[in-house]
Amino acid sequence: MNKLFKILLGLLWAVPLWAQPCSFSISGYITDESTQKPLVNVHIFIEELQIGSFTNELGFYEIHHICSGNYHIRISHIGCETLKVFLPVTETLTFSKVLHHHAELIDEIIIHGEKQNNTTQSSQAIKKEEIVLKGNKNLADLLEEITGVQSIKNGSGISKPVIHGLTGNRIGIINNGIVQSGQQWGNDHAPEIDPFVAHHISLIKGTGALAYSGGSLGGIVLIEPKELDNEPHLHGQTHYITESNGRGHTANLQLEKKSKGFSWRTLGTFKQSGDTHTPDYYLTNTGKKEINGAFQLESHFSEKWKSNLYYSLFTTENGILRGSHIGNSEDLQQAIRAPKPYFTQDDFSYSINAPKQKVSHHLLKWKNKYQFSDKIIGEFIYAGQINNRKEFDVRRSGRSDIPALSLLQTQHTIEGLFTFQLNDRKSIKTGIQNQLIDNSNNPETGILPLIPDYNSIQSGIFGIFQQQKNNWFYEYGTRYDFKHFNVVSISRTNRSIERFNHLFNNFSFSAGIKHFTTEHIKNSLNIGWVSRSPEINELHSNGLHQGISGIEEGNKNLKQEHAFKIIGTTDIKINNHLFIQVAPYIQNINDYIYLQPENEFRNTIRGAFPVFSYQQTNARIIGNDVMIVYEPTENLKLNLRHAYIKGDDTQNKTPLIGIPAQKLFGSISFRLSDKIHWKNSTATLNGQYVFKQNHLLITQDFLPPPPAYFLLGTQLTTQYQLKKSVLKWNLRVENMLNTTYRDYLNRLRYFSDEKGINFIMGVSYDF
């Protein structure tokens, strides 16, 4: 009896000991990222316990009776991408989050996982869910989701972004904090970046991005991977996309985990497609193939010192439309006016033959971040890049497998960046950046190179001051860049070696102001002065540029460009239903460098090609970007975007060539109510009208601009929630009316129509 009493007494004492760890709770607020308003009926769910709660009208939730342990929290809301967070619980916690319910209007900049809302720069971001949905596209095509951005193309698989009428060397592409190197001068040289590596793609349209690079007159594109999570379990994503036009396939796998002492992430991507199809014929030899990969490793040596190692590989092989390479000038002029390209085949093929491109790009980055004190943070970065580009022409005597252009570029970057937090409302960011480039031609081509061998040294220093005072935010910045070219070229006349040295000193300044006029109105103004040195192709190109099917002639006497730009932005939010953003801008560019088509077709042993030469003038570009989002109910959203731009040669009183036409885009989206397992089901109908570029003289190009066109598309998306994973489906139709059209910004519009109807299906699995 005494023994039984002791056992019962022990059990009574044990009950509160067992129950005590399950007395914890989690509570917090869920708000909208762009409006800062509370979100109602957000579901917060603990996967391991299969319990959850919904937010009330204040955006508040509570979950009780939680034991000590590690949990995966799933946060879902209609119209938002489901958020999954790993949360260790050892006590009662306050856990609040923001969701991207109106992602169209988010103007934050995500840099290494940190939101930079305190900036006057005009910016917008593309979120991970959009990148995954359209992962079969390249970077430039993805950026067209942002108002004011279009693409200059060289066929169906090669494109690069045009921001406020500027492209190429005037656009800075920042890949994980490093200026993307390579042969960026060519309009047929698409950025060698796999969009799947990015968690956010941010676009800064102002001139205030002095911390990244000098000479970016058009804007800055930031490609930012996701910060590595503090998650001890293996997680990942797999994506597959197939499309009918070109019979393309895209596959991607991503894995990440926190191991003892470090965290890691790896991913791989494979893409392949064949000849695309217009409504009437195949575009022969327009296939492409990509194999890409990336690896990221991060370790915390102490609370103050964090080290990150990143490597990425991008490889691609792109076919160039066979009908764009013609044998003589008479046939070329006939081909330009022909309704159908020469050499068009009647059958589909995955084969990629000459003319074609093969490119590989390696990026290695080592970053160390050290917090010297609560107010001083330093970053020390080394990066190396290797870019190998080969271009193949249709050559006689079976020599098409020998590249006509073979370039190898190595680049080294060293940076030191410091942030000084003077107080809660003032900060200074400063840094010094050094870059060394070695660019050489492989002699295997047997052809005088388009671009000569050269070395380049560039050093830059910048400083940015930011201050917030009541409802006002101020930003001032300055930058100095020193750039030196050492060029070794071969003369076209007597075949002698010629050496040139070019030295440039560039100064850039910016000032910005932002005013939170009311709770619903925000105004910002950014003014900048930017200098840009001419690049190697503008100075010294001399020969056939295969990707544009033309002969380019550089000008060794080109001077620096000097640009003065003003961009204003007004954001208006009314009753959490109507959102309006207006962003007018004007940019004056002295000594603007442009590629002028000459009234000449030149015969060479490689065929007949039009001639282009680099010239300078004074230019003015004005425009306005407008976006309107109306959400009358939680299930219905209307989106309207309009981009107007006009460019003029103020010196010669003529229009600028290569400026995009006006573009109007609209969409209507309907969201279905969430079911037990089915979430975020949306149907979207969209239309795009591109105006004819009438602001151009008929003598300025080989052909007049193509007529205006309208494209209709649709998109269906949904996801199925499993216990600890998510399965997502999407179906898209592009050019669903199978419209025949040509785009002014496609350099191959001289020879062919654009792609016809395209059915795209994608599936993703998050685990």
Descriptions of predicted regions:
Residues 62-64, 178-206:
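Short acidic/polar hinge/loop motifs at secondary-structure boundaries
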Residues 531-532, 588-591, 595, 689-696, ...:
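C-terminal beta-signal and adjacent terminal beta-strands/loops
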